[in-house]
């Protein structure tokens, strides 16, 4: 449980093979079966952890319907039905919103709101390891601290980067 409405899921290949490589900020497509619709439903989720852990992690916000709208179908299935040990279909990591050059000396500003923090965390984690002296500004807004997922990871990455600063707006 990452926050009041966000849960992380960790995946490894069922064949025991290696986890595919990916760039910080990339995503995977998750397919789960909807009993109500009798069909597999795909959704894209950012990989919310830097590569190298031997697992893929996604962090999923439970989408609750408002004003008569239904709850999020796939987020509800993931939060309420998927258990440790279940097999879930994932695509290979992909996506163009990625930190491609962690070694760059150019200053970097990362801005996120709500669940949009998920691509920023692996970017910060990668920078903390590969280029800890890079000047980075991380700006994040959320409803309140109960809705601040991955806070520990952000704090740990920023702590290891002497030229980094963060601004949190509630």
Where do the protein language model's features map onto the residues?
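Ferredoxin-reductase
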Residues: 1-87, 142-144, 155, 169-170
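Histidine-anchored nucleotide/phosphate-binding helix
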Residues: 47, 117-129
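A short, basic/flexible loop-to-alpha-helix module at the beginning of a structural domain
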Residues: 92-105
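Conserved S-adenosyl-L-methionine
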Residues: 105, 129-136
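Conserved beta-strand elements of the Class I
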Residues: 109-111
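Active-site catalytic pocket residues across diverse enzymes, especially alpha/beta-hydrolases
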Residues: 127-131, 157-158
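Reductase modules of NAD(P)H-dependent flavoproteins
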Residues: 135-170
């Amino acid at each position: 449980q990452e926050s009041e409405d966000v849960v992380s899921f960790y995946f490894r290949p069922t064949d025991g093979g290696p986890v595919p490589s990916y760039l910080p900020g990339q995503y995977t497509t998750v397919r789960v079966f909807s009993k109500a619709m009798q069909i597999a439903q795909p959704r894209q989720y950012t990989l919310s952890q830097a590569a190298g852990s031997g697992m893929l992690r996604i962090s999923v916000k439970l989408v609750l319907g408002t004003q008569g709208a239904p709850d999020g179908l796939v987020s509800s299935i993931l939060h309420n039905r998927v258990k440790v040990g279940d097999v879930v279909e994932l695509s290979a990591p992909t996506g163009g919103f990625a930190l491609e050059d962690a070694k760059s000396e150019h200053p970097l500003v990362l801005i996120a709101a709500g669940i949009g923090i998920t691509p920023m965390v692996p970017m910060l984690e990668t920078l903390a390891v590969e280029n800890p002296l890079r000047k980075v500004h991380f700006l994040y807004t959320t409803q309140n601290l109960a809705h601040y997922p991955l806070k520990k990871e952000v704090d740990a990455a920023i702590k290891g980067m002497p030229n980094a600063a963060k601004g949190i707006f509630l």
